[in-house]
Each structure stands twice: as C-alpha cells, then as structure tokens.
Amino acid sequence: SMEEAVNEVGSQLGRRGEADLALVFASTAYASDLPRLLPLLRRELSSRHWLGAAGGGVVGTRADGTAAEIEQAPSLSVTLLNLPGAAIDSVALSTTSLPDLDGSAQTWQEWSGLNPQHCRSQILLIDPTSSNINDLISGMDYAFPGAEKIGGIACPHNAPHGSLLFDDRVVTGA
C-alpha cells in the first residue's frame, strides 16, 4: 500500500533533518491516492520545497544502496537534497494561457514569476494533459536562455486530478 511505501521511505530518510528540496516520484499505481501522498510524506520527512510527478516507471535506490528501476508496479522514490546557499523559487504554471512566443522575454519572465538574474537552473515537470507543451518549453528557453533545464512529462493516469506534486498539492500544468 502507499502507506507502507511512505513508512519505508520515512524509516530510511527520516533521520536526516530538513532538506532544501524533496523530489518525489510515484508510480501511477498510486494515481488515485496522489492527493494523500505529500501530506503522508510530510509527516515522515521535512523539506522546505516539494516537487514530483507520477510515472509509469520509477528510479531510485533500495534500502541496501542498489539502484533500481521499477516499471508498471507500485513504487515510490524520494530524493532529499541539501543545497547550501541555494535560493529555490518554486512556481506552478498554467499552460492554458501562455504569453505570445513573439513577445518579449520580459513578458515570459513576469508570467513565470521567476527572476532571470537569480534563475541559473530549472526543473520543469509537465502534466501530460497540459496544452501548449512545446510552446511552454520554447518560451522558458527564450525567457531564461542561460538557465540549465531538466525535467520531463509525467505519466498519464485515469484519476480525476493532475500528475504533478507541488508543495502540498497535486496540480496540472507545469
């Protein structure tokens, strides 16, 4: 069950103190329970920021330290990052109404709420039901050309909510 997976993660990582960022990846086997996942994890782990997605396959490290990829089966992976001196700005973006791609970079920067002078890297996770995915990626590249970007598109599922985990809620968009 998801509760057992959360308890196992908590027993492995709970003694580490507060992290700056928690990256959470849950298999779509837990799709209907995604709204409960972050509140359960927050009881076990402490992090200033939470970000994650549902996936068809989840990569992580087992309790014995070996790497594993689990596909199409219940799985949960949590990575806690301590980033001394880093400033983390987390934003949830709606992809339904993007700025014009022919507009200014400043318009995209203001729309995203990110300061280009402090944005050296980005983790961009996108819900598979989002519209304008290519335009979003192009716009973020245009607005933040010097920022390194990593991320991907979450896995679709049949639950009536998004696939992205953001702070304490499940969202769509990016």
Feature annotation, model-predicted:
Residues S1-A174:
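Cofactor- and metal-binding active-site motifs of prokaryotic enzymes
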